[in-house]
Structure formats: structure tokens, C-alpha cells
Curated annotation (Swiss-Prot):
Protein name: Sucrase-isomaltase, intestinal
UniProt keyword Transmembrane helix, yes or no: yes
Post-translational modification: The precursor is proteolytically cleaved when exposed to pancreatic proteases in the intestinal lumen. Sulfated.
One of the record's GO cellular component terms: apical plasma membrane
Membrane topology category: Single-pass type II membrane protein
Residues exposed to the Cytoplasmic side: 2-12
Assembly mode: The resulting sucrase and isomaltase subunits stay associated with one another in a complex by non-covalent linkages.
């Protein structure tokens, strides 16, 4: 019985599938643990920009 050799395209697709699968598993683990991927310490010297959207009903009444 002859052994099948994979073509270059098949090898590239297998590698791409493995990479996408590992990223998907990592995202599921991070989402399931509900822990942030990056933890900022209170002594972090980099300021954090917080943007908040507010809706003013006064403008909507006009």
C-alpha cells in the first residue's frame, strides 16, 4: 500500500486550520474564565483613557 504524500497546498491548509483552531480555543478559554487578558496594576504609569457616551434628551426633543 502506497503512502499518500500531501501537496504544498494541503500542508498549508492544515497548518492554517491548526492556527485558527488554537486561536479559537484560546478565545473560548478567556471568555469562559471572564478574566481580562491584560491586568492593569494601580501603579501603572500609563494613563487610561475612558470614553463615555451620554445621550442628552434635550437635543432629541427639538
Amino acid at each position: 500500500m502506497a503512502r499518500k504524500k500531501f501537496s504544498g497546498l494541503e500542508i498549508x491548509l492544515i497548518v492554517l486550520f491548526a492556527i485558527v483552531l488554537s486561536i479559537a480555543i484560546a478565545l473560548v478559554v478567556v471568555x469562559a474564565s471572564k478574566x481580562p487578558a491584560v491586568i492593569k496594576l494601580p501603579s501603572d504609569p500609563i494613563p487610561t483613557l475612558r470614553m463615555e457616551m451620554t445621550y442628552h434628551t434635550d437635543y432629541m426633543l427639538e
